[in-house]
A protein has these predicted regions:
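An extended, acidic, His-containing surface patch that forms the Zn2+-binding/catalytic region
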Residues: 104-306
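Midchain, well-structured core segments that form catalytic/ion-binding scaffolds
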Residues: 1-145
C-alpha cells in the first residue's frame, strides 16, 4: 500500500500559469511583426493557495494587457494566447476560463473640435506655477541629492503646442501606415459623439541632465500639493468650459464638428465606418477580481492582497 504523499502529484494551476507565462513570452517574437509600437504585458494575480502540500494547486490566474494600433493586430495576438491557454490546460489537467476586463476601440479624431478647443487654450494661455510650487519642487530635488534649480519645472509645460504640430512630432516616430498610438479609455466616447482630447501640462520636474529620470513618487508627491497640481486642473477646466460655451453659442461650430463625425463614421453612429463597442451588451463589470485591501492597524495604515 502506497501512502498518498508518496505518489506522483498531478500538475496543477501553478504549472499552468508558469507554462502559459513562459510559452507566451517566447511566442511574442512570432505574434506580430516588430512595428507599430505594440505592447503585451502580463500580471499574475493568483498562483496557488496559501501553502504547499501534495495537493495540486487548484487555481491560478494570468492577466494580459494588449496595446496595438489596429484591432486586427490585437486579435492576432489574442488568438495566440487563446491557443496557448487551451494547450496548457490540457497538459496540466486544468480547465481554462477566459474573460475580458475591458476592450476599447481605436480613437476617432475630430479636427473641428481640436481647432475650437485650441483656440480657447490660446486665449487663456498655458498653466503657470507660482513660487510656492517651485519651493516644493526644489525641496524634492534636494531630497534626491540634486542641486535645486531656480526654475525646477520642465519648461515645455508653459508653452502651447498646436495639435497639428504635436501630431507631426508623433508621426515622425511612427511608420507611415500607423494611424493610432498608445491607449486610453476615453476613446470609446469618440465613436458616439464628436470628441477632443485635451492635454494640459502636469507638474513635471526638469531633468538635471540628459537621460535622468525622477522616481515615480516625485510625480505622485506633486499631485498631492495644491500649488503644484491646481494649475493643471484649473486651466483644463477653463478651456473645457469656454469650449462648451462656444459650441452652445455658435451653431456653426457644433455643426462643423458633427459633420466631421458623420463623415469619419460613415454616416454617424451605426454608419458604414462606425465601430461598435467591443464588449458584449450583457457584459458584467469585472468587480470580482482581487484588489489590494487597505486597513488601519496598531502599526499604522497597511495593505494586503486578500
Amino acid at each position: 500500500m502506497t501512502h498518498a504523499h508518496a505518489i506522483a502529484r498531478a500538475p496543477g494551476a501553478i504549472d499552468a500559469v508558469c507554462l502559459m507565462y513562459t510559452n507566451s513570452k517566447m511566442m511574442k517574437e512570432s505574434m506580430l511583426r516588430h512595428a507599430g509600437s505594440w505592447t503585451l504585458n502580463e500580471f499574475i494575480p493568483i498562483a496557488g493557495q496559501a501553502a504547499a502540500d501534495n495537493i495540486a494547486p487548484a487555481i491560478g490566474q494570468l492577466q494580459y494587457a494588449m496595446r496595438a494600433p489596429t484591432l486586427p493586430m490585437c486579435q492576432a495576438a489574442f488568438d495566440v494566447l487563446d491557443r496557448n491557454a487551451d494547450h496548457v490546460a490540457a497538459m496540466t489537467h486544468c480547465t481554462v476560463t477566459k474573460a475580458w476586463i475591458t476592450r476599447t476601440r481605436a480613437g476617432l479624431p475630430n479636427h473641428a473640435m481640436a481647432e475650437v478647443t485650441f483656440h480657447n487654450f490660446e486665449q487663456l494661455g498655458a498653466p503657470e506655477w507660482a513660487e510656492e510650487a517651485k519651493v516644493f519642487a526644489r525641496a524634492l530635488q534636494k531630497s534626491l541629492a540634486l542641486e535645486p534649480m531656480q526654475e525646477p519645472f520642465f519648461e515645455g509645460l508653459t508653452k502651447l503646442t498646436p495639435p497639428w504640430e504635436a501630431e507631426k512630432a508623433f508621426r515622425a516616430q511612427l511608420p507611415a501606415w500607423q494611424l493610432n498610438y498608445a491607449a486610453d479609455d476615453y476613446v470609446d466616447y469618440t465613436w458616439h459623439a464628436p470628441t477632443v482630447r485635451l492635454y494640459v501640462g502636469r507638474p513635471t520636474l526638469q531633468a538635471p541632465k540628459s537621460g535622468y529620470r525622477y522616481p515615480e513618487w516625485v510625480r505622485h508627491a506633486m499631485g498631492g500639493v495644491p500649488a503644484c497640481i491646481d494649475p493643471m486642473w484649473s486651466k483644463a477646466s477653463a478651456v473645457i468650459a469656454t469650449t462648451l460655451i462656444d459650441l452652445l453659442s455658435d451653431p456653426s461650430l457644433l455643426e462643423k464638428a458633427q459633420a466631421e463625425f458623420r463623415d469619419r463614421a460613415g454616416g454617424g453612429v451605426g454608419g458604414s465606418k462606425w465601430v461598435a463597442p467591443l464588449l458584449p451588451a450583457d457584459f458584467e463589470a469585472p468587480i470580482g477580481y482581487r484588489w489590494p485591501e487597505y486597513v488601519d492597524t496598531p502599526r499604522g495604515r497597511e495593505w494586503t492582497v486578500p
